Design a protein with these regions (language model features):
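Basic nucleic-acid-binding alpha-helical/helix-turn surface characteristic of O6-alkylguanine DNA
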Residues: 4-133, 184-187
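Pre-recognition alpha-helix immediately N-terminal to the DNA-recognition helix
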Residues: 107-111, 138, 176
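Short Lys/Arg-enriched helix C-cap and helix-to-coil transition segments
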Residues: 150-157
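Major-groove recognition helix of helix-turn-helix-like DNA-binding domains
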Residues: 139-144
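Terminal helix-turn-helix DNA-binding modules in bacterial transcription factors
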Residues: 145-149
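…primarily DNA-binding HTH/wHTH and HhH modules…
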Residues: 160-187
Length: 187
C-alpha cells in the first residue's frame, strides 16, 4: 500500500491520493483520491482521469475551493476504515460525509447508504424505492456522479437482469467489491 497526498486553498479542501493494490482473485484496485472539507469527506474516487476531472470541477465550483496537498484526521480515519473494509473486517463506515451535488443526486446518494453490505439492488428497484419508477436513467446518472464511492456504495446497484453495469471505477473493480462483500467468500 502506498499513500501519496494532495489538498485545497480558498477553503480547506484536502485531497489525499492513495494507492491500494488489492489482490483479490488475481485482480487489482488502483489509485484512489480522498478529499475533505470542514472535517467531512467529500471525495473518494477512482483515478480515472476523464471521470475525475468532471467530479473535481463540480466539487471545486460548488465549494468554491481548490486543491493542495495535506492530510487530516478525517483522511486518516477513512484510510483506516477502508483498509479494514478491504481486509473483510468492516461492513459499515462512520466517516462524516459532505455530499456535493444537486438535491436529486443527494437524494439518490442518501438512499444508496441504505443498501446493506452484501446486498444489491437494481436501478429499477432503486427508482421505485425513491418513489419515481420512471426515473431509472436519471437515477443511473446520479449514481454515476457519486463522488464518494465505496463509502456511498454505488457499486451495489446492478442491472435488472442481475448483470454488472456502469461503475466509475470500471466493471472489474465493481466485481471485486461485490465479491469482497459476498457471503460466498472463500477467505
Amino acid at each position: 500500500m502506498c499513500h501519496i497526498a494532495v489538498v485545497l486553498v480558498s477553503q480547506t479542501l484536502l485531497v489525499y491520493r492513495i494507492l491500494w493494490i488489492l489482490t483479490l482473485l488475481q485482480s487489482r484496485l488502483t489509485v484512489r483520491l480522498l478529499s475533505f472539507l470542514r472535517e467531512k469527506l467529500c471525495l473518494c474516487d477512482w483515478k480515472i482521469e476523464e471521470r475525475r476531472i468532471i467530479i473535481d470541477r463540480r466539487i471545486q465550483k460548488e465549494l468554491q475551493a481548490s486543491y493542495k496537498e495535506g492530510i487530516s484526521e478525517v483522511i486518516t480515519r477513512t484510510i483506516g476504515q477502508l483498509d479494514e473494509y478491504f481486509a473483510g473486517r468492516r461492513t459499515t463506515f462512520d466517516i462524516p460525509l459532505l455530499l456535493v451535488g444537486t438535491d436529486f443526486q443527494k437524494t439518490v446518494w442518501n438512499e444508496l447508504l441504505n443498501i446493506p453490505y452484501g446486498k444489491t439492488i437494481s436501478y429499477a428497484g432503486l427508482s421505485q424505492k425513491l418513489g419515481n419508477p420512471k426515473a431509472i436513467r436519471a437515477i443511473a446518472s446520479a449514481n454515476g456522479a457519486n463522488p464518494i464511492s465505496i463509502l456511498v456504495p454505488c457499486h451495489r446497484v446492478i442491472g435488472s437482469d442481475r448483470k454488472l453495469v456502469g461503475y466509475g471505477g470500471g466493471l472489474p473493480a465493481k466485481k471485486i467489491l461485490l465479491d469482497l462483500e459476498s457471503s460466498d467468500r472463500l477467505f
